[in-house]
């Protein structure tokens, strides 16, 4: 093993990557970048029965979306490839047969039916389920359907120092003679990960806490194969708000679902970094560069992290507000295109969207909220109850007169910008003996069809003179058609 820091993210394509899985990838990436080391991606595709088509692509898409670039792995290559375990099968068989030849592993001929019955009987007797080692000393050879099991030492302990949890000790007698090579010639996770971590010169293994009980098995394999083991660090679990294991019932779990829901990659990197790590007890917003600079295992918690959806939304809103109008518009376009009102408006283009985004940037927490906040700035097909044009303290006649006066004042403006509009419309309210809010409210409804909308005059400036005057004229027509009220 070299002195260089080399870490790996080794997902199994048995499903689409969830946030806990990607958090592990990110901690490995941060550790590598902080230490000037290498981040390797290895696809552990040896479980053929549970293999999910498209999962590898989803894994790589998630990494690319978050900017977790890898130094070796799929699409990159490297000196220690191939980086798909299904392409490394001869290495695992060679290691397994070496262990058999040295008396450290053995062929097991027990059928699946026999093993199922064994497990049922053990459970009935309230014993821990496990293999009874009946083939351990029989000296059996290879045959169809046989597996290779590792010979666990029957006494003693296996201890190691976890870089997060400190000294950890396991009794060997409580370990099972686990399978290392299956009957189909594919290795189990235990053998494949050990063989590959050694072959790829992995210096540190940062993985989820759920793999902690497997560590003694791996250390025994390292010793039996004559390898030097890497250093281990087991990351804390991620729990839902109710402190149960994070699952679909808490909301989205697939990383790509968060992308589709309108979360920014910057947000996800920042947020996931705080699920088990903290720089101090108060700082919550970090740039990517700061995370790389500050990240260290000494500040990774031993206790489970709680996934807080409200905090995620808050953080995403904060990041949205830091974007330039151009950047936000580029990111918003795919979401706006999905809204039929906007798509059919004839106004959806990048230049126009750059003007729209500052109007709603402060209100959005996710990109998928943008369309609902601004569709009426694109679409002229706005409908509303004309009664909304009448302030509750005014009559229809007063409101109609006010709208006509405002329309005439706006039409006469030499410059149709927000400052000029406010400069002329605010005094008009006084002339009409109205409060500014009353006149502004009428204009807001007339120009947007909404009672709650982005800043009025800035919105009207983006709409432009022609569209604004047309919308106000339509409002006057609608109001005129209502029965007259008498005060």
Swiss-Prot record:
Subcellular location(s) of the protein: Cytoplasm
Alphabetical list of PANTHER family matching this protein: GLUTAMATE--TRNA LIGASE, GLUTAMATE--TRNA LIGASE, MITOCHONDRIAL-RELATED
Domain of life per record: Bacteria
HAMAP family named in the record: Glu_tRNA_synth_type1 (MF_00022)
Enzyme class: ligase
Source organism of the structure: Dehalococcoides mccartyi (strain CBDB1)
GO terms of biological process kind: glutamyl-tRNA aminoacylation
Record NCBIfam families: gltX_bact (TIGR00464)
Family affiliation: Belongs to the class-I aminoacyl-tRNA synthetase family. Glutamate--tRNA ligase type 1 subfamily.
Keyword entries, A-Z: Aminoacyl-tRNA synthetase, ATP-binding, Cytoplasm, Ligase, Metal-binding, Nucleotide-binding, Protein biosynthesis, Zinc
Annotated motif 'KMSKS' region, positions: 245-249
Sequence motif 'HIGH' region, residues: 11-21
Transmembrane segments annotated in the record for this chain: none
Name assigned to this protein: Glutamate--tRNA ligase
Essential cofactor(s): Zn(2+)
Record-level GO cellular component terms: cytosol
Gene3D superfamilies reported in the protein's UniProt record: 1.10.10.350, HUPs
Taxonomic placement: Bacteria, Bacillati, Chloroflexota, Dehalococcoidia, Dehalococcoidales
Record function comment: Catalyzes the attachment of glutamate to tRNA(Glu) in a two-step reaction: glutamate is first activated by ATP to form Glu-AMP and then transferred to the acceptor end of tRNA(Glu).
Reaction equations catalysed: tRNA(Glu) + L-glutamate + ATP = L-glutamyl-tRNA(Glu) + AMP + diphosphate
């Amino acid at each position: 093993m070299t002195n260089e820091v080399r870490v790996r993210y080794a997902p199994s394509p048995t499903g689409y990557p969830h946030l806990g899985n990607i958090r592990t990838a990110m901690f490995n990436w941060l550790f590598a970048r902080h230490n000037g080391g290498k981040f390797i991606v290895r696809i552990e595709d040896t479980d053929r029965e549970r293999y999910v088509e498209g999962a590898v692509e989803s894994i790589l898409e998630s990494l690319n979306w978050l900017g977790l670039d890898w130094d070796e792995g799929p699409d990159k290559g490297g000196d220690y490839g191939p980086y798909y375990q299904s392409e490394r099968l001869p290495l695992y068989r060679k290691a397994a047969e070496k262990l058999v030849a040295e008396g450290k592993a053995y062929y097991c001929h027990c059928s699946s039916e026999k093993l199922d019955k064994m497990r049922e009987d053990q459970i009935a007797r309230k014993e821990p389920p496990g293999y009874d080692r009946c083939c351990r000393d029989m000296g059996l050879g290879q045959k169809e359907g046989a597996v290779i099991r590792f010979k666990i030492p029957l006494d003693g302990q296996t201890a190691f120092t976890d870089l997060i949890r400190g000294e950890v000790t396991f009794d060997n007698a409580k370990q099972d003679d686990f399978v290392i090579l299956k009957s189909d010639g594919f290795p189990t996770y235990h053998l494949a990960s050990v063989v590959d971590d050694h072959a790829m010169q992995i210096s540190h293994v940062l993985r989820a806490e759920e793999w902690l009980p497997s560590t003694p098995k791996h250390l025994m394999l390292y010793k039996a194969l004559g390898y030097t083991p890497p250093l281990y660090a087991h990351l804390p679990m991620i729990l839902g708000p109710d402190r149960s294991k994070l699952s679909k019932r808490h909301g989205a779990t697939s990383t790509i679902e968060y992308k589709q829901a309108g979360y920014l990659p910057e947000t996800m990197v920042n947020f996931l970094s705080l699920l088990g790590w903290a720089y101090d007890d108060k700082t919550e917003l970090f740039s990517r560069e700061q995370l790389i600079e500050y990240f260290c295992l000494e500040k990774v918690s031993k206790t489970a992290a709680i996934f807080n959806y409200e905090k995620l939304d808050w953080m995403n809103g904060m990041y949205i507000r830091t974007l330039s109008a151009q950047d936000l518009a580029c990111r918003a376009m795919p979401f706006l295109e999905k809204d039929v009102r906007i798509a059919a408006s004839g106004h959806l283009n990048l230049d126009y969207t750059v003007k729209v985004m500052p109007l709603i940037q402060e209100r959005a927490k996710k990109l998928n909220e943008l369309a609902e906040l601004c569709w009426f700035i694109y679409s002229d097909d706005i409908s509303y109850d004309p009664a909304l044009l009448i302030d509750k303290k005014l009559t229809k006649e007063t409101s109609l007169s006010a709208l006509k006066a405002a329309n005439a004042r706006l039409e006469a403006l030499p410059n149709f910008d927000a400052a000029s509009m406010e400069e002329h419309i605010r005094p008009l309210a006084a002339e009409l003996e109205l409060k500014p809010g009353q006149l502004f409210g009428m204009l807001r409804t007339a120009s947007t069809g909404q009672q709650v909308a982005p800043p009025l005059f800035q919105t009207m400036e983006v709409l432009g003179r022609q569209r604004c005057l047309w919308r106000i004229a339509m409002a006057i027509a609608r109001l005129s058609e209502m029965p007259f009220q008498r005060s």
